[in-house]
């Protein structure tokens, strides 16, 4: 049996899945196939008729945001809900117990403004999760609340990058200095220093 992409066989003759290294062997793959190869245990569970555990959990820490982007469907609202910290920590414990391996902090707001954001991120990393975040980046930087000690804990960062020209700030915030260039540069530099595989997406 082969996968549709480039006819690469992923099964051994006895019907078991081949190891990732045996399948890859210098080939280039689409991101979806690469992800599949990273989770051969899930494929084996499906093959054996067992329900596989989720790979990734997304946690919306808060609906509040520190920006008021004119183009955001959540802009101009008086919302400040946030998940209680203890609930988040218990959820992380539960996710780990059922075999989840990655967590991404996201939501209708900016996750980094949760009052216990740093505590939650450290707790999740201590549990062994791969970590990601969807963020506007406004709080990331050497002179901002989220610094290297937290940035280095993330395996990937999805940073809002709506434009690089200086004038676009007027669309984004009630305060100045939110242009994404400084934040993007900071996160990229710190990731280069602290991660074997820096990964920033816009």
Sequence positions of predicted segments:
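Radical SAM/AdoMet-radical enzyme domain recognition
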Residues: 82-106, 113-202
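Short, acidic/glycine-rich phosphate-metal binding loop used to engage nucleotide
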Residues: 78, 109-110
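N-terminal pre-core extensions flanking Radical SAM catalytic domains
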Residues: 1-79
């Amino acid at each position: 049996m082969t996968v549709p992409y480039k006819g690469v066989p992923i099964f051994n003759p006895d019907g078991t899945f081949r190891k990732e290294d045996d399948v890859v062997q210098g080939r280039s793959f689409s991101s979806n196939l690469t992800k599949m190869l990273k989770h051969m245990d899930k494929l084996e569970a499906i093959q054996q008729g067992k329900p596989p555990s989720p790979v990734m959990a997304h946690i919306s820490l808060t609906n509040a945001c520190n920006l008021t982007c004119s183009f955001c469907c959540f802009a101009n609202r008086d919302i400040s809900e946030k998940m209680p910290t203890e609930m988040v920590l218990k959820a992380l414990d539960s996710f780990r117990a059922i075999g989840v391996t990655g967590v991404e902090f996201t939501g209708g707001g900016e996750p980094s403004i949760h009052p216990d954001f740093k505590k939650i991120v450290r707790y999740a990393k201590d549990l062994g999760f791969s970590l990601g975040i969807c963020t506007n980046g406004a709080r990331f930087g050497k002179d901002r609340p989220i610094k290297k000690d937290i940035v280095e804990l993330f395996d990937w960062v999805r940073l809002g990058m709506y434009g690089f020209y200086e004038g676009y700030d007027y669309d984004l915030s009630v305060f100045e200095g939110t242009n994404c260039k400084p934040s993007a540069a900071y996160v990229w530099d710190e990731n280069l220093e602290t991660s074997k595989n820096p990964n920033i997406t816009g």
